Protein backbone atom coordinates (compact mmCIF):
# COMPACT_ATOMS: atom_id res chain seq x y z
CA UNK A 1 0.00 0.00 0.00
CA UNK A 2 1.72 3.17 -1.20
CA UNK A 3 0.95 6.92 -0.93
CA UNK A 4 2.65 7.07 2.47
CA UNK A 5 5.30 9.43 1.11
CA UNK A 6 2.85 12.32 0.89
CA UNK A 7 1.44 11.94 4.38
CA UNK A 8 2.92 13.64 7.44
CA UNK A 9 4.69 11.42 9.93
CA UNK A 10 2.09 12.13 12.62
CA UNK A 11 -1.51 13.31 12.39
CA UNK A 12 -4.71 13.62 14.39
CA UNK A 13 -8.03 12.08 13.38
CA UNK A 14 -10.77 14.33 14.73
CA UNK A 15 -14.50 14.42 14.14
CA UNK A 16 -17.33 16.88 13.78
CA UNK A 17 -19.25 14.90 16.41
CA UNK A 18 -19.22 11.61 18.26
CA UNK A 19 -19.92 8.41 16.29
CA UNK A 20 -19.03 9.92 12.90
CA UNK A 21 -16.62 7.11 12.04
CA UNK A 22 -13.29 8.30 13.45
CA UNK A 23 -12.26 4.83 14.59
CA UNK A 24 -12.84 3.19 11.21
CA UNK A 25 -10.98 6.03 9.48
CA UNK A 26 -8.16 5.75 12.03
CA UNK A 27 -7.92 2.01 11.37
CA UNK A 28 -7.85 2.62 7.61
CA UNK A 29 -4.96 5.06 8.06
CA UNK A 30 -3.12 2.77 10.46
CA UNK A 31 -3.26 -0.03 7.91
CA UNK A 32 -2.60 2.13 4.86
CA UNK A 33 0.35 3.97 6.41
CA UNK A 34 1.64 1.07 8.54
CA UNK A 35 1.26 3.39 11.50
CA UNK A 36 1.09 3.20 15.27
CA UNK A 37 -2.26 4.09 16.88
CA UNK A 38 -2.95 6.06 20.05
CA UNK A 39 -6.25 7.13 21.57
CA UNK A 40 -5.33 9.31 24.56
CA UNK A 41 -8.74 9.18 26.27
CA UNK A 42 -11.20 6.27 26.06
CA UNK A 43 -14.66 6.75 27.56
CA UNK A 44 -16.82 3.65 27.82
CA UNK A 45 -16.66 0.28 26.02
CA UNK A 46 -13.84 -0.93 28.26
CA UNK A 47 -15.17 -4.48 28.46
CA UNK A 48 -14.69 -4.94 24.71
CA UNK A 49 -11.29 -3.29 24.55
CA UNK A 50 -12.47 0.16 23.55
CA UNK A 51 -11.47 1.76 20.28
CA UNK A 52 -7.90 0.52 20.64
CA UNK A 53 -9.10 -3.07 20.57
CA UNK A 54 -11.41 -2.30 17.68
CA UNK A 55 -8.60 -0.74 15.64
CA UNK A 56 -6.37 -3.75 16.27
CA UNK A 57 -9.12 -6.07 15.01
CA UNK A 58 -10.00 -3.90 12.01
CA UNK A 59 -6.36 -3.62 10.93
CA UNK A 60 -5.89 -7.37 11.33
CA UNK A 61 -3.11 -7.23 13.91
CA UNK A 62 -2.08 -10.27 15.91
CA UNK A 63 -1.76 -9.85 19.66
CA UNK A 64 2.00 -9.58 19.28
CA UNK A 65 1.71 -6.94 16.56
CA UNK A 66 -0.88 -4.98 18.51
CA UNK A 67 1.39 -4.80 21.55
CA UNK A 68 3.83 -2.73 19.51
CA UNK A 69 1.46 -0.68 17.37
CA UNK A 70 -1.54 -0.02 19.62
CA UNK A 71 -0.39 2.25 22.42
CA UNK A 72 -2.11 2.22 25.82
CA UNK A 73 -4.52 5.04 26.52
CA UNK A 74 -3.53 7.78 28.94
CA UNK A 75 -7.02 7.52 30.46
CA UNK A 76 -9.43 4.57 30.37
CA UNK A 77 -12.71 5.83 31.80
CA UNK A 78 -15.74 3.62 32.33
CA UNK A 79 -18.60 6.02 31.65
CA UNK A 80 -19.71 6.56 28.03
CA UNK A 81 -19.69 10.32 28.50
CA UNK A 82 -17.56 13.35 27.73
CA UNK A 83 -14.05 13.01 29.19
CA UNK A 84 -14.59 15.68 31.86
CA UNK A 85 -17.77 13.95 33.07
CA UNK A 86 -16.36 10.43 32.80
CA UNK A 87 -13.26 11.45 34.73
CA UNK A 88 -15.28 13.25 37.40
CA UNK A 89 -17.38 10.10 37.91
CA UNK A 90 -14.16 8.35 38.97
CA UNK A 91 -12.85 11.23 41.06
CA UNK A 92 -10.24 12.11 38.43
CA UNK A 93 -9.19 15.24 36.60
CA UNK A 94 -7.54 14.89 33.19
CA UNK A 95 -3.98 16.22 33.33
CA UNK A 96 -2.26 17.71 30.27
CA UNK A 97 1.06 16.17 31.26
CA UNK A 98 -0.37 12.68 30.67
CA UNK A 99 -1.48 13.67 27.17
CA UNK A 100 1.98 14.44 25.82
CA UNK A 101 2.60 12.80 22.46
CA UNK A 102 4.33 9.42 22.80
CA UNK A 103 7.72 8.89 21.22
CA UNK A 104 7.37 6.35 18.42
CA UNK A 105 9.39 5.31 15.43
CA UNK A 106 7.44 5.79 12.22
CA UNK A 107 3.95 7.12 11.52
CA UNK A 108 1.54 7.85 14.37
CA UNK A 109 -2.25 8.20 14.18
CA UNK A 110 -3.85 9.95 17.17
CA UNK A 111 -7.63 9.52 17.50
CA UNK A 112 -9.59 12.09 19.46
CA UNK A 113 -12.64 11.39 21.61
CA UNK A 114 -15.88 12.96 20.40
CA UNK A 115 -15.93 16.34 18.69
CA UNK A 116 -13.35 19.10 18.65
CA UNK A 117 -14.76 21.17 21.50
CA UNK A 118 -15.51 18.29 23.86
CA UNK A 119 -14.11 19.17 27.30
CA UNK A 120 -11.31 17.00 28.64
CA UNK A 121 -11.81 18.92 31.84
CA UNK A 122 -13.87 22.03 32.48
CA UNK A 123 -11.01 24.36 31.51
CA UNK A 124 -9.39 22.23 28.79
CA UNK A 125 -11.01 21.53 25.44
CA UNK A 126 -9.82 18.77 23.16
CA UNK A 127 -9.03 21.27 20.41
CA UNK A 128 -6.61 22.97 22.80
CA UNK A 129 -4.63 19.74 23.11
CA UNK A 130 -4.59 19.38 19.33
CA UNK A 131 -3.12 22.86 19.15
CA UNK A 132 -0.49 21.93 21.76
CA UNK A 133 0.47 18.81 19.79
CA UNK A 134 1.11 20.92 16.66
CA UNK A 135 -0.14 18.15 14.40
CA UNK A 136 -2.30 18.43 11.28
CA UNK A 137 -5.83 17.07 11.32
CA UNK A 138 -7.89 14.72 9.19
CA UNK A 139 -11.46 15.73 9.94
CA UNK A 140 -14.13 13.02 9.74
CA UNK A 141 -17.69 14.13 9.05
CA UNK A 142 -20.99 12.61 8.07
CA UNK A 143 -21.81 12.77 4.39
CA UNK A 144 -25.51 13.59 4.57
CA UNK A 145 -27.95 16.23 5.75
CA UNK A 146 -26.56 18.52 8.45
CA UNK A 147 -22.92 17.98 7.63
CA UNK A 148 -22.42 21.41 6.08
CA UNK A 149 -23.14 23.24 9.32
CA UNK A 150 -21.24 20.82 11.57
CA UNK A 151 -18.23 20.58 9.28
CA UNK A 152 -17.92 24.28 8.51
CA UNK A 153 -18.18 25.11 12.23
CA UNK A 154 -15.42 22.59 12.93
CA UNK A 155 -13.22 23.98 10.17
CA UNK A 156 -13.75 27.48 11.51
CA UNK A 157 -12.71 26.39 15.01
CA UNK A 158 -9.55 24.75 13.65
CA UNK A 159 -8.67 27.76 11.49
CA UNK A 160 -9.19 30.13 14.43
CA UNK A 161 -6.49 28.25 16.34
CA UNK A 162 -4.15 27.94 13.38
CA UNK A 163 -4.46 24.14 13.22
CA UNK A 164 -3.75 22.82 9.71
CA UNK A 165 -6.33 20.53 8.11
CA UNK A 166 -5.10 17.87 5.70
CA UNK A 167 -8.60 17.25 4.43
CA UNK A 168 -11.98 15.70 5.09
CA UNK A 169 -13.26 12.14 5.12
CA UNK A 170 -17.00 12.02 4.50
CA UNK A 171 -18.48 8.93 6.09
CA UNK A 172 -21.70 7.46 4.72
CA UNK A 173 -23.48 7.26 1.40
CA UNK A 174 -21.77 9.57 -1.11
CA UNK A 175 -23.42 12.98 -1.47
CA UNK A 176 -21.88 14.89 -4.36
CA UNK A 177 -23.50 18.23 -3.57
CA UNK A 178 -22.24 18.19 0.02
CA UNK A 179 -18.76 17.22 -1.09
CA UNK A 180 -18.52 20.04 -3.60
CA UNK A 181 -20.01 22.56 -1.16
CA UNK A 182 -17.51 21.65 1.54
CA UNK A 183 -14.54 21.82 -0.81
CA UNK A 184 -15.71 25.14 -2.23
CA UNK A 185 -16.83 26.89 0.97
CA UNK A 186 -14.51 25.19 3.45
CA UNK A 187 -11.54 25.37 1.07
CA UNK A 188 -10.24 21.97 2.08
CA UNK A 189 -10.03 18.80 -0.02
CA UNK A 190 -12.18 15.75 0.53
CA UNK A 191 -9.64 12.95 0.86
CA UNK A 192 -12.22 10.18 0.72
CA UNK A 193 -15.93 9.52 0.55
CA UNK A 194 -16.23 6.35 2.62
CA UNK A 195 -19.46 4.45 1.99
CA UNK A 196 -20.79 1.98 4.55
CA UNK A 197 -18.58 -1.12 4.52
CA UNK A 198 -20.38 -4.45 4.73
CA UNK A 199 -17.40 -6.04 6.47
CA UNK A 200 -14.89 -3.45 7.70
CA UNK A 201 -11.45 -4.98 7.99
CA UNK A 202 -8.18 -5.62 6.17
CA UNK A 203 -9.68 -6.72 2.84
CA UNK A 204 -12.14 -3.83 2.72
CA UNK A 205 -9.45 -1.33 3.69
CA UNK A 206 -7.06 -2.64 1.05
CA UNK A 207 -9.79 -2.15 -1.55
CA UNK A 208 -10.58 1.38 -0.37
CA UNK A 209 -7.01 2.63 0.13
CA UNK A 210 -6.22 3.30 -3.56
CA UNK A 211 -9.14 5.77 -3.59
CA UNK A 212 -7.74 7.80 -0.70
CA UNK A 213 -6.49 11.15 -1.95
CA UNK A 214 -3.15 11.86 -0.32
CA UNK A 215 -2.80 15.41 1.08
CA UNK A 216 -1.52 17.87 -1.47
CA UNK A 217 -2.48 15.72 -4.46
CA UNK A 218 -4.84 16.97 -7.11
CA UNK A 219 -8.09 15.10 -7.50
Feature map (PLM): residue ranges:
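Conserved glycine(s) of the Walker
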Residues: 20-21
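N-terminal phosphate/diphosphate-binding loop that engages ATP/GTP or pyrophosphate donors
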Residues: 4-10, 24-93, 98, 102
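Switch II (G3) loop of P-loop NTPases
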Residues: 99-121
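Inter-motif core of Ras-like GTPase G domains
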Residues: 121-144
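Short internal beta-strands
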Residues: 39-40, 138-141, 166-172
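Hydrophobic anchor at the beta1->P-loop junction of P-loop NTPases
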Residues: 13-14
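C-terminal lobe/tail of nucleotide-utilizing enzymes
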Residues: 4-5, 156-219
Amino acid sequence: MSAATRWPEQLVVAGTDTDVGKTVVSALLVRGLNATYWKPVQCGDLMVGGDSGRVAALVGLTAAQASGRILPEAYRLAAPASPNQAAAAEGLVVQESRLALPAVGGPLIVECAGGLLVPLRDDLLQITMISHWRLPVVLVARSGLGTLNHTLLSLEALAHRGIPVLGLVLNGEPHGANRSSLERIGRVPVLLELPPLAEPGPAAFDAVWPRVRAPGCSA
